[in-house]
Amino acid sequence: MASNSPMRRIWILVVTLWLAAGVSCEKRHNKQIDPELASLGSAEITGQIVEIPGEFPANDFYNYAYVLKYRVLKVHRGQVNGSEIFVAHYNPLKPRATVADEFSGKVGGKVERFRAGEIHRMALEEPLDKFWMGGIIDKYFENKGTRYWAVWTNPGEP
């Protein structure tokens, strides 16, 4: 085949499309659920952070849990009370992959930092005070309702 022949161009186009389709399908099928999400907690949800009420304090002197408000987008297992819930995250300035310590119990995930509007897939436990007895910053204290403990937090999709 000549280097610029129509057959060669068609052959290259077919191979390129075939490879692109294979890569596209691989990405779709590679979305496996994190086994920690599927096994930890009594509920698993996808939720969007409604707001972060203030800045997170530094972890210089003590460990704490910070309560964030989430809009529930989907409940994957278990149940939660309402379409908006309050979720406490342990030491939210630390990436979830390195946050666990001798005080927290098993917590973790793949979220690097928390920003309003982000979507997270989380394994949750309730009530908060059954899983965390340390400092709690809850700027929603006037709002009644369950406070959930975020056991595992990964980035999520709508």
Question: Can you annotate each of these PLM segments?
Answer:
Residues Q32-P35, G109:
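A structural connector/turn signal
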Residues A2-W11:
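Bacterial N-terminal signal peptides that target proteins for export
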Residues I12-L19:
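Hydrophobic helical h-region of N-terminal Sec-dependent signal peptides
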Residues A21-S24:
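C-terminal motif of bacterial Sec signal peptides marking the signal peptidase cleavage site
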Residues E26-R28:
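Bacterial signal peptide processing site
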Residues Y64-P158:
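Disulfide-stabilized netrin-like
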Residues G41-D60, Y66-K69:
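Structural detector for short beta-strands of small beta-barrel domains
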